[in-house]
Amino acid sequence: MKFIFTCGGTAGHINPALAVAGRLKELLPDSEFLFLGAEGKMEMELVPREGYQIKPLKITNLSRGKNLKALSHNLATLKNVVVSYREAKAIIRDFQPDAVIGTGGYVCYPVLKAASQLHIPTAVHESNAVPGLTTKMLAKLVDRIMVGFEESRQYYPQPEKVIVTGTPVRGQFAAYTKAQAKRELGLAADEKLVVSVWGSLGAGHMNVIMTELIPLLDGTQGFHLLHGAGKMYYPGVCESLVKTAPDLTGRKVDLREYIFDMPRVMAAADLVLCRAGASTISELTYMGKPVIMVPSPNVTNHHQERNARVLEKAGGAKVLLEGEFDAQSLLKLVRELLADEEKLSSMSAAMGSLAVPDATDKICGIVMDIANQ
């Protein structure tokens, strides 16, 4: 069988596609896979790292601004949609897939629209409780809509198309024990690791907080810190810390632009500091990781805060709102949690209770079903 996946923009859209493709590859070893992504975006780097071919489409997002610059950008985007639709149609005709699957990002629209008009079976996965603009636009075109939450059904005009699957997690997240992961990262089994990661693109405000927090560490804090700054912010974080905390190794700090070995790093983590995107939550619940969440305020309908409050209510997360804490208060909370093994254990159990471990298999079943129609 042949499958086309389309996804892009952030790891939260890319990783679910990689998870499903990886499982399909195990179930159907002779299958062929092709990814379509947005030119110059993160998927063009992450997908080939997993061994898949990806072709770029010239597609850009819509700006919600109302000024002349935003209008000009949106006019260019509309032109790019037409061009990328034609490109996608030609690629689909040439590849002849049995199904086309989208997992989020604006590149999904022209690809799934083209597949639909060519009568190729289509499915889209929406990991957030509230669908994004692209998913809304595709709802009437695709054959199946797979969602992460039961409450999501209400947002779709044809609920009979909607199947609750959970959000898929890559198989690599089951590949490491905590002790093995710590050993490979150069840590002893009893050394604590705090992982700080704020979305695949990074987050400006949280990088400011972390550049203020890191100089407060002197190497005797009782834990190692691994901070992923994100490609956009990494140079600025490095420049700042050269002045305020030049000896990162002595402070037990590992600063990275991007955490490419996320399954290993998360397996080793004793506590995670992060955003509340749906894909991140799926990975954290799958691994049962205690978490301090700072939901992004820059998302539609505050869906990240809603995601985080579910975890908080279950007892697996502490939720802090951006702008309502500083580096010192965050460090104080980190220290308090790491000092309370019983609390960490209960948070871990609560996170694990929310996992949907068979989400990837559910989605693969749906994809194979439509491909065989």
Question: What are the language-model segments listed below?
Answer:
Residues 343-357:
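A short, well-ordered alpha-helix in the C-terminal region of glycosyltransferases
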Residues 2, 32, 53, 116-179:
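Active-site-proximal region of nucleotide-activated glycan assembly enzymes
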Residues 97-99, 263, 267-281, 289-290:
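Acidic donor-binding loop of glycosyltransferase active sites
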Residues 87-100, 107-123, 136, 140:
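Glycosyltransferases and closely related glycan-assembly transferases
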Residues 3-10, 30-85, 231-233, 323:
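Conserved nucleotide-sugar phosphate-binding/catalytic loop shared by glycosyltransferases and other
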Residues 356-373:
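C-terminal alpha-helical cap of glycosyltransferases
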Residues 52, 120-121, 270-271, 288-296, ...:
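Structural loop-to-beta junction motif characteristic of Rossmann-like glycosyltransferase folds
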Residues 46, 178-183, 187-272, 305-309, ...:
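Donor-nucleotide binding loops and adjacent catalytic segments primarily
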